Amino acid sequence: MSVLTSPRGKVEVVHCRRTESQDVYCIKSLIRKFTCKLFGKLNIIYLLEKANLAVTLCNDKEEIMAQATFLDYPNWNVAKQDDWVSVFRELDSDIPCTPLNTLFMHLFVAVDEYSVGCCKEILRTVYKAVPELHFIFLIVPSYMSLGSTLITVFDQVGNIPCLTYEEDFAVHICHRHSHYPQLHVRKARVEDHDDLMPIFMRYDTILKETYGEYFLAELIEAQDEENHAVVCEVEGTAVGFMSVCSRVNMQLLHECFDLGPFHGLCFPHPDDVLESPQDLSVRRSQDAELRSSSQGSQKIVEELQEPVSPDTMENIQGNIAREAASEEALTAVQSGNVSEPEDIEKLSDISTGYAQYHHVSSRSLASLVLPEEPVHFRPIYRGASAAFCIQLFCIDEKYEARSLDFMNFVFSLFSDKNFCVISLPHLTPEFFLIQNFVKMVPFNTCTLEQDLYVFHRAGLLKSINIRFATLLDTPGVENLVSTLMLNKSILEDLDRYNKARKDPDGTLLQAFVAEVAEQIVGIAVIRNEMDIEYIRSHYNIEDFIYFSHHQREEHGHMHHFALNPIFRHYTKFFLKEILRLGFKSCLYYRVYPKSREGKFQNPYAHSLTSALHYLVPVRPRRQIVYPLEKLGINAPSKAVSKDPMSYALNHTNRKLTLEPKITVNAKIIVVGASSVGISFLETLVFCSHMKFNNLTLISTHGLPGKKLLDTEQRKFLASDHCFNDKDYALMSLCSWVNVVVGRMTGIDRAAKHVVLSTDEIVPYDHLILCTGQQYQVPCPTEADISQHLTNREVPNSSQRRYTGKVPCNHFTLNEEEDCFKALIWIRNNSITTEGNIIVYGNTIDTYTTVETLLNLGVSGSRIHLVQPPPASTITCINNYSVESAVADALGAAGVTMYRDAILAQWNDGLHPDPIYSASFTTPTKPFRLQCSMFFSFCEKNVDYETFKALNDACLVYDSRLVIDTNFHTNDIAIRAAGSLTKFSNRYYSNEWTHSNFSSKEIGFQLAAAMLHLFDPTLEPVTEPPANLDRLIPMYKGAKIQGGILPGSYHYLHIAKPAIPTPLEVQMAQPNYGLELVTGSAKNGTYFRIHINKYKMVETITCLSREPFPASNYIRLFGQHEQLLNNLCARYDENLITDLYSYFTEPWCLALFHDRFIDLRKELRQILASKEEEDLPSIEQLAHQIEDEEINPTEKPRQYLKRVFEESIYKTLVERSTLDYLHYNRYHLPMYAWPGIV
């Protein structure tokens, strides 16, 4: 906050922020004729879209006082966008302007009364936001004066001609030192104590309490050759302090952190041991296999596709991805021998050997797999330490953006050191200084509660130059990428660029190199993005850009990016220069699923990019399933409707190049890859303005979505339609989340770590428990059926836990890996041709499993569906028509059903492994079945190991883990969600649990609750009133289940969250509403819609022998029946005989569009707004009629309709609807609008 005073003495409290799209109207209102003469006639939206930095100044009422826009190339066309440096160097050789330290002002507007103060405040903010910036140029016609405002901050340096017409333009310059100067750094003196202590006390009092009031003076006095204290000063006053020491505990750092890329922070020594002989031989064989030809990588893929165990597959895939990420981040740190300017001492060689390095972003790219027997080779460095450390650092908040000014001086104090390190508690918010450091990745076994940051002396160089690659750069690039798995692909693209500048198919190709001191330290290869229509229609790219303001050729597809980690802090600058030099405005980077990335040397293989954390992940868009045959020529183009290989999309553009992200280093551990856990992670990952460095998932089988089962195969388990394999590919959570494969067996709340089954520990700051409930191995009652016992005579074993060895042919299917194991067992043991299969349970998964077995070729006569007594009167399908059709299909297939049967014994009470027979009791007489394979789908429960871990940790557990309405357990650091949990008894709502709601919505709400801890842009959470504190939240998302049932019936059931109640009881209620049914369940044409008393769609049930677009039907939930083309009236008039056909008609496709909800909100906002001064809004009129404040002579509906049609509201609604259709015409070309009819 700053205070501006006008010449008249008026005062305004102002602050700066990034310009937003809604500012455009106010910016236009501040433009004067003089503004147009200075800057030209501008399209403000277009200018903001292409700007690198746009700053708005607001007062405390959020009224816009001023705005300025800056780009990285000059306006008025006085120089080419990609070649302005030489022009401005010739103008004044004393101004060392470079693309790194220069911006150009393309617009400035302000409220006249405060314009001078606004201008200075904006410039100070810009220089603070961009520490590398030293010069801002302003170019205006030479005949124009700058006016009374700009002339106070800009000085003319010369004239320059225009390239397109004969006119000269005056060049003015604004220097950093006039607004936010570099800090003077010197050795500390004792007299600095009084200046510095208030700054220290502002942040922390622990040092004073621990070491006494004069600890700082004592530290300054204790300086020697190994310890130095330095300060930065402004006008003779110390405003910052840094204490550095040459003594570093290298042994501890080598034990805890992977320091491979920097040679262990040591000088090279002949006796260094950089790799074990075994690893060396393995690496050589891998290199020969992977780099010789694409056949080698194909071989790996084929091996992965063989029927191996899921555990083995996860480990293989994780290791391949991890090695690729390690080698990518290595990027040629053999950039030793960098010849430096005279003011920096020549660097020693940096030897990487064969050490592997996981950069922050690279670590996120690879799954962190804990193998069963982890064996880690640690390099041994025998050379002297090449690092010094920062022991204490503090700086006044006003000057923290200049923190890096310390580094030149402290490196001069240690002329024999190449590295500066600092260790910080990992919860320390990321401050300006460490944003320039490289965060090192700890080893899996590291328990140090500190993060290590490293900065290399060469990182101080400002002479980095980004340019197009040339043929002479090839040796330097080869040296840079020699350790990359994809080096062959990069070098091939570079060679293609040098020879033809394009691909054989004509796609434009561009290659850029980053050069420091005549050495190549970075390489990037981009192509023109040819699938931009597909990207626009399948990804929410318009969250970041106004698509219409970007030309087709301005979209670039980044294929390769590698940068020496020493210069990691120049990554954004590298990306910015790629956009400027390549005449691009947007860059896209694709991450393909692992199965595709495994083919390292093929067209789909992109090099893993260390720039990933500087890009933003783009959410995929929900797609309409089009009836293409019915639409004919009105169908969307093939560029929109095609379904190529799914990939996750990452993006950057000119606006984002100077946009900082909020970094969160808190260790957030999610236990369980359930739909709730995945939804939670998805929400955090797609917060584009935030970067979570320590997201970890602990899961028995790692991330889901491995596509172990072919798409064409029947699924053993029913689906909740939260996520599918394509969704996982589109998210690419493995790019952002560390995955630990293991089971949680304990929680140490005091030490804040999770204990795994392998005795590994995973520390946490926030623990999220989403393990859900799983099918358990049933515990036989051990009743002797020879005694002819009935169910009433046997003990209830439902609460008992099976503790024996699980038989090898017994299967409880909880996730895809379990289904894959079952499938392999069926194939390897000839189950499809011989032996009985028992499916035990009464959930919907029993039906989908039976259908899968039938589809695999198992004869129905050998399948026995045994259903235990139901726990309630509500069946899993809760619809007699569907149940009857499924029962008939089971009978027709020859499947035998047994009802109310309780498992008594396996193998007549003998050793149960493997199971040869199973005995059951019933209400009448017992029976015994031969068994080759046993599937158990008894009631789900919390896994015993999970329960024991929770119970031992003293978390409150009452049949489930107890939480409050904010997901908290009795430990503030531990949250939980999903079917694992129940609400505390103080809410008096035991019937309602998270199981009643959509898992995806629960995960989203959990993430939203946690984001308030990390995101300063969110409004603070207000405490609910005392009387509302005892109410549980009610979520509105639909609860969905679906699958393929016996008879090859495709089944889908969508309903609002509710306490389960028999359908017949629901329909007997007087306010039930309407039931619309077409078709017959037994014929496979059944479609049922329940419309509630408010005329809203509340339930949808589909049963069809033909596949149907389930994702379309899910969008119908919660819609008003009139929105469905007066559904009820048409049904009553017998105009609808087939709802399947009805919802494939072209008129309804807009309902399935992902942005239709936005249109509804916009239209509602129009009706709620007062468009005419003296008249109430339509919404107010409706309330007045309801409250009987007005009594129209006609029916209320007719009255409102007449008012609507006679007022401006009708025109506004029609215009908004037509705008929606026009803007989304690539998805909705089947609709007509004025001009095409």
Swiss-Prot record:
UniProt-annotated stretches for the region Disordered: 278-301
Location of this chain's protein in the cell: Cytoplasm, Cytoskeleton, Flagellum axoneme
Pfam families: CFAP61_dimer, CFAP61_N
InterPro entries the UniProt entry points to: CFAP61 (IPR038884), CFAP61_dimer (IPR056299), CFAP61_N (IPR032151), FAD/NAD-bd_sf (IPR036188)
GO BP annotations listed: cilium movement; cilium organization; sperm flagellum assembly
Gene Ontology CC terms: axoneme; motile cilium; sperm flagellum
Impact reported for D971N: In SPGF84; uncertain significance
Keywords for the protein's UniProt record, in alphabetical order: Cell projection, Cilium, Cytoplasm, Cytoskeleton, Disease variant, Flagellum
Chain segments annotated as coiled-coil in the UniProt record: none
Basic and acidic residues: compositionally biased ranges: 281-290
Subunit structure: Component of axonemal radial spokes, the protein complexes that link the outer microtubule doublets with the central pair of microtubules. Interacts with CFAP91/MAATS1, ODAD2/ARMC4, RSPH3A, ROPN1, ROPN1L and RSPH9. Interacts with DYNLT1, DYNC1I2 and TUBB3. Interacts with WDR35, IFT22 and IFT81.
Entry function: Involved in sperm flagellum assembly. Plays an essential role in the formation of the radial spokes in flagellum axoneme.
Disorder association: Spermatogenic failure 84: An autosomal recessive male infertility disorder characterized by multiple morphologic abnormalities of the sperm flagella, resulting in severely reduced motility. Some patients also have a reduced sperm count.
Record-given protein name: Cilia- and flagella-associated protein 61
Organism: Homo sapiens (Human)
Gene encoding the protein: CFAP61
